[in-house]
Amino acid sequence: MKKVYVIGSLNMDLCISAPYCPKGGETLSGSGFIANEGGKGANQAAAAAKSGAEVYMCGCVGADPFGGRLVSALDDAGADTRYVRRAEGVSTGIAVIIVTGGENRIILDKGANAALCEEDIDRALENAGAGDVFLTQSENPVKIVGYALKRAKEKGLLTIFNPAPADPAAAEYFRFADIVVRPALKSC
């Protein structure tokens, strides 16, 4: 069976609905607060694992409770998390999502996602081979995403790139992607 390698983000999604976005200095009552495991990379890995694929997740979380929760959720989904590194001195990535009128507004703190490095990529792809599948997106530093796409392509993997969130610098790495996924809107 082919393997699926996901190199990407792991975030805690903190989502709340509000009638409108508060103005500076204003406190507003919200409702329906949800704390979900997320991050585009973690979501890809969980979905692929739940569909029966052999999935290896590579990413970076903080050495904090949110990081532990994210790794546990991926383990529960059936993904292999041996390539998820716990970084000291940095918090796990957080997405604060405010939903107003059915539309979301997201504030992202990349946190440990920004600590992903070339060594993490090399370690995760060490046993990858031709015909395996590689998924990534843009919630990690764009140069690391580009490095990962290039390494996966060199090893003969089918490379899939979801360039979200949008970063004009990511276009430089489209040449290493067999498939570029058009980003979609997200809701809680």
Regions found by a protein language model. Give the residues of each.
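Short alpha-helix plus adjacent loop in nuclease-associated cores
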Residues: 92-97
